[in-house]
Amino acid sequence: MKWLLLLGLVALSECIIYKVPLVRKKSLRRNLSEHGLLKDFLKKHNRNPASKYFPQTEAPTLIDEQPLENYLDVEYFGTIGIGTPAQDFTVIFDTGSSNLWVPSVYCSSLACTNHNLFNPQDSSTYQSTSGTLSITYGTGSMTGILGYDTVQVGGISDTNQIFGLSETEPGSFLYYAPFDGILGLAYPSISSSGATPVFDNIWDQGLVSQDLFSVYLSADDQSGSVVIFGGIDSSYYTGSLNWVPVSVEGYWQISVDSITMNGEAIACAEGCQAIVDTGTSLLTGPTSPIANIQSDIGASENSDGEMVVSCSAISSLPDIVFTINGVQYPLPPSAYILQSQGSCTSGFQGMDVPTESGELWILGDVFIRQYFTVFDRANNQVGLAPVA
């Protein structure tokens, strides 16, 4: 009996998963708007989120282009700890990038005065390097140094993790950002500075039993969202997971069969490529078909550059259906029209990302809120199921 109990405990330990709660906060866009800075931000920063996916690197091992407007609408954030003892930071868990960086005490920029700062001298496990990091944000750069330390993620102690410590951060806009830094969860092939991404380091150390992680984004205004490392929790979805092969290993890129409304193709009629990206809030696609979708749902641009929609349209508009690997994934109007403080905006955004296989679509939080998503590195596939 004791042996059976021991075997049961061993089996249970092999299935342990680690959850990082995500909190939903005001986006950077809303913070800037409330402080009367949104128009100035949009004027100074070129609205080109596409450069996130095709960085122009001056030195491939050191520099990455990462336009700040990618994170303008992100609302989901989690807490990690870096160092011994741990220093806490609020980060975006971003499947559309691969690096980890946080502000540091070496940063004198205005943005750093309003965020948590990592102090290497307060960590007994910090190891310095001679490496540097520079990430371009529109009109300025986040520059910093690279170091190694222990990162605490949802109960996991990720030792010897390389990360960036910012020394300068661009403009006054980041002062209002609801996050301190970024934790990238894409493939190592797109990591700047040759840095090993956090999840890869966790897996290489045998800290999780399965080479995958999963994401649930709640529509609730405050809590319930989670990133799960090393496993899948079926309580977050209904039915069974449908698996989609990763078509290009870099971002979490998959093939989409078609996008339809009322049974008619409105985009991607002959198939297209898409990236599943927790670090992009909206659902983006090529400017021409997105313009047609905006017209179909009655969206028009306001003075802040937002595509506004009548809130009453939510009850009458049809679903927009994404067919992926032969399975239909409908988005109801309550998902693709975003309601906030009595006004409504479109969850779609035009963005041209040309590739050899055609223009890319980005399935951001608008899509992920509807579908529990598994990012399976072992089998290079994405799992999707309707949220519970």
UniProtKB/Swiss-Prot annotation:
SUPFAM superfamilies per UniProt: Acid proteases (SSF50630)
Reactions this protein catalyses: Preferential cleavage: hydrophobic, preferably aromatic, residues in P1 and P1' positions. Cleaves 1-Phe-|-Val-2, 4-Gln-|-His-5, 13-Glu-|-Ala-14, 14-Ala-|-Leu-15, 15-Leu-|-Tyr-16, 16-Tyr-|-Leu-17, 23-Gly-|-Phe-24, 24-Phe-|-Phe-25 and 25-Phe-|-Tyr-26 bonds in the B chain of insulin
Gene Ontology terms for molecular function: aspartic-type endopeptidase activity
Endpoints of the signal sequence: 1-15
Main location class: secreted
Active site residues of this protein: D94, D277
InterPro entries per record: Aspartic_peptidase_A1, Aspartic_peptidase_AS, Aspartic_peptidase_N, Pepsin_A, PEPTIDASE_A1, Peptidase_aspartic_dom_sf
Compartments it resides in: Secreted
Residue(s) carrying Phosphoserine: S130
Enzyme class: hydrolase
Role noted for this protein: Shows particularly broad specificity; although bonds involving phenylalanine and leucine are preferred, many others are also cleaved to some extent.
Protein family per UniProt: Belongs to the peptidase A1 family.
Entry protein name: Pepsin A
Organism: Macaca mulatta (Rhesus macaque)
